[in-house]
Amino acid sequence: MRTLVLGRTPARVAEVLATLRADGFDAEGVSGDEEARELLEGGGFGVLIIGGAVEPGSRASLKEFAAEHGVRRVIDGALREPFDVYVRGEFEPLIREAASGG
């Protein structure tokens, strides 16, 4: 299931993407709301992960936008170290669940 990661810190987005891709997930990442909207508008994303530093107003707006563009699951993230362990324990099970229709 194609996943979009939105986070305000590019280095953290890169770490999340590295783990997801290493584990076989199709994932893209951005740091800005407009970039996220453009990608979501293009379709094909089933999951949106929104990082903990994304402001409440942006978060709410993007959740609504994602729902309008076929995203099955929005995950609110609050990344903790070690990042790879967090991604594997928190994000990946939810992505798999969304992919299976759950």
Map each language-model feature to its residues.
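Ser/Thr/Gly-rich flexible loops in soluble cytosolic domains mediating phosphotransfer, phosphorylation
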Residues: 65-102
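Conserved phosphotransfer microenvironments
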Residues: 50-65
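Conserved acidic segment of CheY-like receiver
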Residues: 1-9, 48
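Short alpha-helical
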Residues: 11, 35, 56-57, 82
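Short hydrophobic/Thr-rich beta-strand motif most characteristic of the beta2 strand and flanking loop
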Residues: 24-32
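Acidic, metal-coordinating helix/loop segments flanking the phosphotransfer/catalytic sites
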Residues: 31-45
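Short hydrophobic helical patches associated with two-component signaling proteins
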Residues: 16-17
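Conserved residues at beta->alpha junctions
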Residues: 7, 31, 52-53, 78
